[in-house]
């Protein structure tokens, strides 16, 4: 990947710019940046970087927020805390540091099945709830919320696929497919066993009729899910998704986060190609200025979601969470 010298340049640049980041959340805030710095400190065995990471994360923990969401709110910070504790990056007691906030999050989402508008914008909280459930198995409310969100997503997607062929269909099909991709990723992440088989059948039928294009990402997660659950009958669809989806990749127009997200998927794809080598070359860039130019415009360029913190974490730990 990249040299230790370039990693340290990234650390200095991110640390310098982190002070101007106002959010405390995971995607665009200080907790996401601290996560990358903690991983880097472990990789380089550098206590100075660890101190920077700890300071940033402390700021995230003490800052008051009414946002309970995963991307930029309280549950994203909770996810980072659990990750740091379970991976022994810090020595801390979750209940002492985050017990009150955790209870507030659970109460906020306990009746999410009665708020469908909130459900479609809050589904990523499952990432937090899943790791929380492994930490606190005695709280039945946690799994209940996970189940309600999955069922809500499945109902929404089933209705969209049912109307897909209607000439008066007005919703954005790109958005619906993005939601389905996010749903598959969540099912795979949680090893969720009660996912809707009929929803998968509806998707496969639409694909077989030529109404949905191939997608490497959807093919990858479909393959992972059916393999884990010993399902049969989807091999042709998955093979075509991966084969043709890979052909649709154009490394020249991909942003930094897209290249990072594709690496693990491409490595597991059946067919290797020159495009993969191009992406790997881009992610091995030693020039900080060129790396910065790969970040999406109009985003928090040092952040975890799209920016340099994601890249730094990825470079220092191949198992860095890409959520």
Q: Predicted regions span which residues?
A:
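An acidic intrinsically disordered interaction segment
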Residues: 1-3, 35-50, 89-94, 183-186, ...
């Amino acid at each position: 990947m990249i040299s230790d010298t370039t990693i340290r340049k990234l650390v200095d640049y991110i640390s310098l710019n982190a002070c101007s980041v106002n959010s405390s959340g995971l995607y665009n805030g200080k907790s996401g940046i601290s996560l990358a710095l903690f991983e880097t400190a472990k990789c380089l065995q550098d206590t100075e970087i660890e101190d920077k990471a700890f300071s940033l994360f402390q700021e995230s923990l003490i800052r008051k927020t009414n946002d309970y969401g995963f991307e930029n709110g309280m549950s994203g910070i909770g996810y980072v805390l659990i990750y740091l504790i379970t991976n022994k990056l810090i020595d801390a007691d979750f209940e002492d540091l985050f017990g009150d906030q955790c209870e507030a999050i659970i109460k906020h989402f306990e009746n999410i099945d009665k708020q469908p508008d909130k459900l479609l914008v809050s589904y990523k909280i499952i990432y937090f709830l899943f790791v929380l459930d492994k930490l606190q198995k005695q709280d039945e409310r946690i799994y209940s919320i996970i189940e309600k969100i999955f069922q809500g997503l499945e109902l929404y997607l089933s209705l969209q696929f049912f109307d897909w062929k209607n000439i008066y269909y007005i919703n954005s099909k790109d958005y619906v497919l993005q939601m389905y991709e996010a749903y598959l990723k969540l099912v795979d992440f949680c090893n969720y066993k009660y996912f809707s088989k009929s929803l998968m059948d509806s998707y496969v039928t639409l694909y077989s009729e030529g109404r949905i294009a191939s997608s490497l990402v959807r093919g990858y997660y479909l393959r992972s899910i059916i393999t884990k659950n010993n399902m049969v009958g989807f091999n042709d669809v998955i093979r075509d998704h991966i084969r043709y989806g890979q052909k649709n990749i154009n490394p020249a127009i991909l942003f930094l986060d897209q290249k990072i997200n594709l690496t693990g998927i491409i490595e597991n794809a059946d067919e290797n190609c020159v495009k993969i080598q191009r992406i790997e070359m881009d992610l091995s860039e030693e020039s900080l200025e060129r790396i910065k130019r790969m970040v999406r415009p109009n985003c928090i360029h040092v952040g975890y979601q799209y920016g340099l913190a994601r890249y730094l974490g990825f470079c220092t730990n191949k198992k860095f969470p890409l959520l």
